[in-house]
Structure formats: structure tokens, C-alpha cells
Design a protein with these regions (language model features):
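C-terminal domain-tail junction helix/linker
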Residues: 1-6, 11-12, 113-117, 138-191
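Basic, flexible linker segments flanking DNA-binding modules
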Residues: 1-32, 101, 109-111, 126-129, ...
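An active-site-proximal beta-strand-loop segment
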Residues: 16-61, 73
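Mobile genetic element proteins and their domesticated derivatives, centered on retroelements
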Residues: 17, 53, 59, 77-78, ...
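Active-site beta-loop-alpha junctions of metal-dependent nucleic acid enzymes
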Residues: 39-41, 46-49, 64-89
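Short small-residue beta-strand/loop micro-motif enriched in glycine and branched aliphatics
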Residues: 60-64, 120-122, 146
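RNase H-like polynucleotidyl transferase catalytic core
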Residues: 91-99, 113-132, 148-151
Length: 191
């Protein structure tokens, strides 16, 4: 049984997750070149790790495209994400993550403790517990990463800031009665 919930105020709970995404080789992948040619063009391009933080109440999202998912990278990402939410007028109380190694590390624990934030983890093998960020991952893949055939990873990354701005400020959400996340955030001055 899946129980749906929504916290009462922005910052009551922030869902955090990492999405691993294959890089696009220069010249394009299979969407540009076709399946057979795309296979020949893919070797050694590696992965991008999309570190995501989504507010439970407003669905306001913060994402960075980083090179890895280590115990050093995740806390550094959270420091910047926390500043993003604070600048938007959101006081973060709790963070929900899966049980990835970077979220079980001492640096992650310490960065949350320094800010007075409670850390909650999902039960193992229950990604639906962190469903709001998992749904955000799916939306991000459908509407940005795989929305059109990019000819390089640089082209795809260059398109990301505009997509994220649209997601936060203009894209309506069914769960928010068709309103964008920005409509539920008390202070978006300077954006």
C-alpha cells in the first residue's frame, strides 16, 4: 500500500537523490546517429551524476551535474543546495535520502548536523519512499535529457539551466493543481 503525503510547509522535508546518466559522445549518440552507429560512437564517454534536491511541499528543485557520487561530493552539493533553499526563504528541517554510501558517510552526517538538519533514510530497496525526487528524476529525463537528440554532452548540459528554471517557475504540476513550484515558495526575490 502506497500512502501519499505532503508536508505542510516548504523545508519540512527535502528529498535528495543522485541520478546516474550516460554522457553523450561528440557527434551524438544513437538518437542522432541511429542505433548501430551510436553503439560505435559511445566508448569511453563516462557518466554524469545529477545530484537532486526537491522540496516535499513545493516541489522546488535544485540540481547540479557533477562528476561522481563520492562522500566528498555529496556534502559539498548539499551545502550549495541548502544555500539555494535558504536564499528562497525556505528553512530546511529534514532531509530524506536513500542508503547510498555517500549518504551514510561521516561528512554527510556532519554537514547536516552543523546546519541542525535531521537526516532520514528510506528503507532499503524502497525507492518509492523517496518518490518526489524519483518522479523529478523521471520528469528531468523525459523533458530535458532525452527530450531531443543532442549532438554532444556540452549541448545537453547547456540546455539544462533553462529547463530547470522553467520547471521551477513555469511548469505546472498535477500535485500542485496545475501551479508551478515557485507558487508555493514564500520568497523568490532575486530570481
Amino acid at each position: 500500500v502506497i500512502r501519499r503525503y505532503e508536508h505542510a510547509a516548504p523545508g519540512d522535508l527535502i528529498h535528495v537523490d543522485i541520478k546516474k546518466l550516460g554522457n553523450i559522445p561528440d557527434g551524438g549518440g544513437h538518437q542522432v546517429l541511429g542505433r548501430a552507429a551510436g553503439r560505435k560512437n559511445r566508448s569511453g564517454v563516462g557518466y554524469a551524476y545529477l545530484h537532486n534536491a526537491v522540496d516535499d511541499h513545493s516541489r522546488l528543485a535544485y540540481t547540479e551535474i557533477l562528476a561522481d557520487e563520492t562522500k566528498e561530493t555529496a556534502p559539498a552539493f548539499w551545502t550549495r543546495a541548502h544555500k539555494f533553499f535558504t536564499d528562497a526563504g525556505i528553512t530546511v528541517h529534514r532531509v530524506l535520502t536513500d542508503n547510498g554510501a555517500c549518504y551514510r558517510s561521516h561528512p554527510w552526517r556532519d554537514v547536516l548536523a552543523e546546519a541542525g538538519i535531521t537526516h532520514k533514510r528510506t528503507r532499503p530497496y524502497r525507492p518509492q519512499t523517496n518518490g518526489k525526487v524519483e518522479r523529478y528524476n523521471r520528469t528531468m529525463l523525459e523533458e530535458w535529457a532525452y527530450a531531443r537528440p543532442y549532438t554532444s554532452e556540452q549541448e545537453r548540459r547547456a540546455a539544462f539551466p533553462a529547463w530547470l528554471y522553467t520547471y521551477n517557475h513555469h511548469r505546472g504540476h498535477t500535485a500542485l493543481n496545475g501551479s508551478p513550484p515557485a507558487s508555493r515558495v514564500p520568497n523568490l526575490m532575486g530570481w
